[in-house]
């Protein structure tokens, strides 16, 4: 029985899923918007939002926790130097999911996941 088990399996084993979301979280922090399938976007939200909340309080311990979850110093630096201060006054809800149709090959529902207060630089790069 799968009672009270949260999270989606996404037809992957645990280590594959963990690595995939670690990479996707890094891409979202780096580019501030990514395109993926809707279920992956909904699950990625559960990974990225706690990272941004962690980045709102800058400490060595929090930086080490963020590094343990992302394994990328560049991402940790952006989280704590840019995103933490940017979202300091916002109590959660740092990401937005926008549905964008269906993929041509397999008709999978696609979505953009983005950070809500994207910088103008990131918006120009996305277009």
Curated annotation (Swiss-Prot):
- List the residue ranges forming a coiled coil, or say none: none
The terms describing its cellular component in GO are: cytoplasm; cytosol; cytosolic large ribosomal subunit
Whether Ribonucleoprotein counts among this entry's keywords is yes
Tell me any Pfam family this protein matches: Ribosomal_L17
Recall the GO molecular function terms of this protein's record: structural constituent of ribosome
Q: Which GO terms describe its biological process?
A: cytoplasmic translation; ribosomal large subunit assembly
PROSITE patterns of this UniProt entry? RIBOSOMAL_L17
Q: Is the keyword Metal-binding assigned to this protein?
A: no
**Record's signal peptide:** none
Keyword list, A-Z = Ribonucleoprotein, Ribosomal protein
Q: How does it assemble?
A: Part of the 50S ribosomal subunit. Contacts protein L32.
Record-stated family: Belongs to the bacterial ribosomal protein bL17 family.
Q: Which PANTHER family match?
A: LARGE RIBOSOMAL SUBUNIT PROTEIN BL17M, RIBOSOMAL PROTEIN L17
Per the entry, what this protein does is: Requires L15 for assembly into the 50S subunit.
Please identify the protein, giving its name as recorded: Large ribosomal subunit protein bL17
Q: Which organism is it from?
A: Escherichia coli (strain K12)
